[in-house]
Amino acid sequence: MAWKAPKIVEVPCGMEINMYVSATRK
C-alpha cells in the first residue's frame, strides 16, 4: 500500500477494516 495517499483515502479504508472486523467477530 502507498502511504502517500491523503487521509481522504485512509478514512474509507479504516471503515472497511472496521466492517470486516465486525463481520468476522459475528
UniProtKB/Swiss-Prot annotation:
Keywords: PQQ biosynthesis. Transmembrane segments: none annotated. GO terms for biological process: pyrroloquinoline quinone biosynthetic process. InterPro entries: PQQ_synth_PqqA (IPR011725). Belongs to the PqqA family. Required for coenzyme pyrroloquinoline quinone (PQQ) biosynthesis. PQQ is probably formed by cross-linking a specific glutamate to a specific tyrosine residue and excising these residues from the peptide. This is Coenzyme PQQ synthesis protein A. The lineage of its organism: Bacteria, Pseudomonadati, Pseudomonadota, Alphaproteobacteria, Hyphomicrobiales. The gene is pqqA.
